[in-house]
Curated annotation (Swiss-Prot):
Belongs to the GreA/GreB family. It comes from Rickettsia prowazekii (strain Madrid E). Pfam families: GreA_GreB, GreA_GreB_N. Necessary for efficient RNA polymerase transcription elongation past template-encoded arresting sites. The arresting sites in DNA have the property of trapping a certain fraction of elongating RNA polymerases that pass through, resulting in locked ternary complexes. Cleavage of the nascent transcript by cleavage factors such as GreA or GreB allows the resumption of elongation from the new 3'terminus. GreA releases sequences of 2 to 3 nucleotides. InterPro entries: GreA/GreB_C_sf, TF_GreA/GreB_CS, Tscrpt_elong_fac_GreA, Tscrpt_elong_fac_GreA/B, Tscrpt_elong_fac_GreA/B_C, Tscrpt_elong_fac_GreA/B_fam, Tscrpt_elong_fac_GreA/B_N, Tscrpt_elong_fac_GreA/B_N_sf. Residues 45-74 form a coiled coil. HAMAP family: GreA_GreB (MF_00105). This is Transcription elongation factor GreA. Disulfide bonds: none annotated. GO terms for biological process: DNA-templated transcription elongation; regulation of DNA-templated transcription elongation. The gene is greA.
């Protein structure tokens, strides 16, 4: 897959950090674990060896995945963004039309999304409904609980805590 995907500068640094850690710490540690397990004798019935090999396969797979992701990442510094229209990186405050409760979401890349921290993927239904809207606009979003309607109250572009 060669398609670019948006990611915040902080999100990209987090990917790079994980990649570096896997390559320089975990890879070395798993090699040592495999060598130690080999010393325990017959490999055909060596559970430690099999577990270490499985972990090695997982680590190598994750390294490949992270290398692919970092190669395809389109890094967007949201601190340099501004404007009234909602786009990637926006922190958007909404009012629920039914409950009049205020809710805030941050539109991020799919690998940074974490609903517990109010970070929603740009590919999510709520983000898709919000993109291009501005303060005062109303949006409707289909949720598992049915159709929800929101009014956009604020749009900001500010540093994220990941």
């Amino acid at each position: 897959m060669n398609t670019k995907f948006p990611i915040t500068a902080k999100g990209f640094k987090k990917l790079e950090h994980e990649l570096k850690h896997l390559k320089h710490v975990e890879r070395k540690k798993i090699s040592e674990d495999i060598a130690e397990a080999r010393e325990h004798g017959d490999l055909s019935e060596n559970a430690e060896y099999e577990a270490a090999r499985e972990k090695q396969a997982f680590i190598e797979g994750r390294i490949k995945e992270l290398e692919d992701m970092t190669a395809r990442a389109e890094i967007i510094d949201i601190c340099k963004l501004s404007g009234d229209n909602i786009k990637f990186g926006a922190t958007v405050t909404l009012i629920d039309d039914d409950t009049e409760e205020e809710v805030t979401y941050i539109i991020v890349g799919e690998y940074e999304a974490d609903i517990t921290k109010k970070r929603v993927s740009i590919a999510s239904p709520i983000a898709k409904a919000l993109i291009g809207k501005s303060v005062g606009d109303f949006v409707e979003v289909t949720t598992p609980k049915g159709l929800k309607s929101y009014e956009v109250v604020t749009v900001e572009y500010k540093e994220l805590d990941l």
